């Protein structure tokens, strides 16, 4: 029998949850990609860079059951959905953190989309928030941020559309091995197709999300 074993860093669902602290020692950085994931700036600052790229081809037959505006060229379009996102993360003494993520989305081959505001956003600051670690397991997050809880039935990043959905607000977070609490108040961002033209919506979203992980010994 032949056996193969590989090791890789776990990739989180959301980019700001990625943890590359295991690369803090320079001797563990063997490739250029690892070198940009944890860079020391003196003894107190660390920063990292990253990104993601998605190209998605879609083809439809009788889009929206054929109920499309009269000026549409066809109700059976095809389109190429393009998305690139870059992010930078800076931390200070594991106490403060600044996270920024830029978004570029575009639609090709289809001049008549039904949801253009979700298909194209040429350049935007998708996320820009500041974290402050408080006493105990508490953390305060302020700024433009993504929300995704549980199975994402109620609040999600909306991964299906080409442009993901951020919020602008404040979140007080508590994290322990078995309990997670998010207390939040925010405004959804209204995405526009141009360059740096997204605005805060007048709608608001506030609430408390709690998740408990029971002990394995109970089962």
PLM segments and residue spans:
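Signature for the C-terminal beta-barrel architecture of outer-membrane proteins
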Residues: 136-140, 158-219
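Transmembrane beta-strands of outer-membrane beta-barrel proteins
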Residues: 47-55, 98-100, 138-140, 181-183, ...
């Amino acid at each position: 029998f032949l056996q193969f074993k590989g090791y890789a860093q776990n990739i989180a669902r959301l980019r700001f949850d990625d943890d590359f602290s295991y690369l803090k020692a320079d001797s563990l950085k063997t490739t250029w990609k690892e070198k940009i994931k944890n860079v020391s700036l003196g003894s107190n600052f660390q920063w990292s860079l990253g990104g993601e790229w998605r190209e998605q081809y879609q083809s439809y037959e009788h889009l929206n059951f054929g109920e499309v505006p009269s000026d549409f060229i066809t109700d059976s379009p095809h389109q190429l959905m393009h998305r690139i996102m870059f992010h930078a993360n800076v931390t200070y003494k594991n106490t403060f953190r600044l996270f920024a993520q830029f978004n570029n989305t575009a639609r090709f081959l289809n001049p008549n989309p039904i949801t253009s505001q979700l298909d194209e956003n040429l350049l935007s600051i998708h996320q820009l928030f500041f974290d402050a670690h408080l006493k105990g397991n508490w953390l305060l997050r302020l700024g433009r941020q993504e929300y995704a809880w549980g199975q994402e039935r109620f609040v999600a990043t909306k991964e299906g559309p080409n442009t993901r959905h951020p919020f602008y607000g404040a979140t007080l977070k508590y994290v322990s091995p078995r309990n997670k609490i998010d207390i939040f108040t925010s405004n959804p961002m209204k995405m526009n197709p141009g360059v740096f033209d997204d605005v805060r919506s007048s709608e608001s979203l506030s609430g408390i999300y709690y998740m408990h992980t029971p002990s394995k010994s109970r089962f």
